[in-house]
């Protein structure tokens, strides 16, 4: 049984309602009868800016509530916006507020393919959609006569994407201004930074607002994440078309840009100017590497598994092997991550950190000791030959525990599976 039912009246010829109340009443009565008891959200979607003239009379898009409609409409929420993108996004917000995922869309057959194309852009696999034909008669007209669309062309899809992108760009930033944390250790020939959770448009509580990763298991669609990324690129000054994220696998695999890209990897290195590379983080450490002498850079994603596997030094070694970097020239900055105050592991997993150095573990004799992955990363980098003064892990902003600061950072430990993601990024200026 659907948790939400949407009725698409977006193509409604509203001046013809005077002659079509019975058709509309029949549809709404059927929905109310079959779904009102169990569905938590009944919605009519329509357009607020379509108007046209007939017999010299101009009509606007307000659903009339005479002839028995008034009482019935009390069961439905009417969402009326100037565009399909705005309407569906508003409906998505209402669905997400109620944490619903099973949705029935009752839509005229000639609009079904178009509706599916918009939904594919604005929703993720978290949602389960089913479609039902809205039976309409064009003679005497409840709906505008139009050609049934069976396939969306590439040009039409781009038009849909442009409409959505234009709408998303108009949305205000949430939770304050966009904030980028930088390090004085990284020379000015690089663009770099670490994002926080403020200044984006994501509205899901655990993803709000500057989420930078979309997953089939989360409610933030790619188009929203891409808009957040566009705003970051404008603020930081990099080219969003040349942006690459790590494909995390909690390993020590490194992609050397220019070679064949692996299916998954937890580090990237490059010496290409104008290319921005990024490591994800939401408790795991996003690490940025820079060599101002050889003009090369890298990023790594270090969770507790990747830390023990040596992903940080694997990134350093890739820079040395590929670009001729020297250990003494490479600087390393650790981005925000979970602290030992909030991160524990079972004792059998904690033993590996204790064997690396006892200072990496607190309360070792407990069933779930506290782990300091930042300290472990520094120790491994120093053991690998990186100069201690070339490692920054204690910057006042960068050293904040992601789990302890919900106003600033996303956290898997704190927020559970539907967590948001921040990044560390770097590029060589063109």
Swiss-Prot record:
It comes from the Eukaryota. Changing residue 89 to A: Does not affect ability to promote pattern recognition receptor (PRR)-induced cytokines in macrophages. Its EC number is 2.4.2.1, 3.5.4.4, 2.4.2.28. Gene3D superfamilies: CNF1/YfiH-like putative cysteine hydrolases (3.60.140.10). GO terms for biological process: inflammatory response; innate immune response; nucleotide-binding oligomerization domain containing 2 signaling pathway; pattern recognition receptor signaling pathway; positive regulation of cytokine production involved in immune response; regulation of cellular pH; regulation of inflammatory response; regulation of purine nucleotide metabolic process. SUPFAM superfamilies: CNF1/YfiH-like putative cysteine hydrolases (SSF64438). One of its GO terms (cellular component) is peroxisome. This is Purine nucleoside phosphorylase LACC1. Changing residue 278 to P: In JUVAR; uncertain significance. Purine nucleoside enzyme that catalyzes the phosphorolysis of adenosine, guanosine and inosine nucleosides, yielding D-ribose 1-phosphate and the respective free bases, adenine, guanine and hypoxanthine. Also catalyzes the phosphorolysis of S-methyl-5'-thioadenosine into adenine and S-methyl-5-thio-alpha-D-ribose 1-phosphate. Also has adenosine deaminase activity. Acts as a regulator of innate immunity in macrophages by modulating the purine nucleotide metabolism, thereby regulating the metabolic function and bioenergetic state of macrophages. Ubiquitously expressed, with higher expression levels in immune-related tissues such as lymph nodes and spleen. Expressed in both intestinal and peripheral myeloid-derived cells. Interacts with FASN. Interacts with SDHA. Interacts with ATF6, EIF2AK3 and ERN1. Belongs to the purine nucleoside phosphorylase YfiH/LACC1 family. It catalyses: adenosine + phosphate = alpha-D-ribose 1-phosphate + adenine; inosine + phosphate = alpha-D-ribose 1-phosphate + hypoxanthine; guanosine + phosphate = alpha-D-ribose 1-phosphate + guanine; S-methyl-5'-thioadenosine + phosphate = 5-(methylsulfanyl)-alpha-D-ribose 1-phosphate + adenine.
């Amino acid at each position: 049984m659907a948790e939400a039912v949407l009725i698409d009246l977006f193509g409604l010829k509203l001046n013809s309602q005077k002659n079509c109340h019975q058709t509309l009443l029949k549809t709404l009565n059927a929905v109310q009868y079959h779904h009102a008891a169990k569905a938590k959200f009944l919605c009519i979607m329509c357009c607020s800016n379509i108007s046209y003239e007939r017999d010299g009379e101009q009509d606007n898009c307000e659903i009339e509530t005479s002839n028995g409609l008034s009482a019935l409409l009390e069961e439905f929420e009417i969402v009326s916006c100037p565009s399909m993108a705005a309407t569906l996004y508003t409906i998505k917000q209402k669905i997400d507020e109620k944490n619903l995922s099973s949705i029935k869309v009752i839509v005229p057959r000639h609009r079904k393919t178009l509706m599916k194309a918009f939904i594919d852009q604005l929703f993720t696999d978290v949602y389960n959609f089913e479609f039902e034909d809205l039976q309409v008669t064009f003679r005497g007209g409840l709906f505008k006569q139009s050609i049934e669309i069976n396939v969306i062309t590439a040009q039409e899809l781009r038009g849909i994407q442009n409409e959505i992108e234009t709408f998303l760009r108009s949305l205000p930033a949430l939770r304050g201004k966009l904030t980028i944390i930088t390090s004085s250790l990284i020379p000015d020939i690089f663009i770099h930074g670490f994002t926080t959770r403020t200044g984006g448009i994501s509205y899901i509580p655990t993803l709000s607002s500057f989420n930078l990763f979309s997953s089939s298991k989360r409610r933030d669609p790619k188009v929203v994440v891409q808009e957040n990324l566009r705003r970051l690129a404008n603020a930081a000054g990099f080219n969003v078309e040349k942006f690459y994220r790590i494909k995390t696998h909690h390993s020590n695999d490194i992609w050397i840009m220019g070679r064949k890209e692996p299916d998954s990897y937890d580090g990237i290195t490059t010496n290409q100017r104008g290319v921005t590379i990024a490591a994800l983080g939401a408790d795991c450490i996003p690490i940025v590497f820079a060599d101002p002498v050889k003009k090369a850079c890298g990023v790594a994603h270090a969770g507790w598994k990747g830390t023990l596997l040596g992903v940080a030094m694997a990134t350093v070694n890739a820079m040395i092997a590929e670009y001729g970097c020297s250990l003494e020239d490479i600087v390393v900055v650790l981005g925000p991550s979970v602290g030992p105050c909030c991160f524990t592991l079972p004792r059998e997993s904690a033993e590996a950190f204790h064997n690396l150095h006892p200072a990496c573990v607190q309360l070792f004799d407990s069933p779930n000791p506290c782990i300091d992955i930042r300290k472990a990363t520094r120790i491994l980098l120093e053991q690998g030959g990186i100069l201690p003064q070339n490692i920054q892990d204690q910057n006042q902003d960068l050293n904040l525990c992601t789990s302890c600061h919900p106003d600033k950072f996303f956290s898997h430990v704190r927020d559970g599976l539907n967590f948001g993601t921040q990044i560390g990024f770097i590029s060589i200026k063109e």
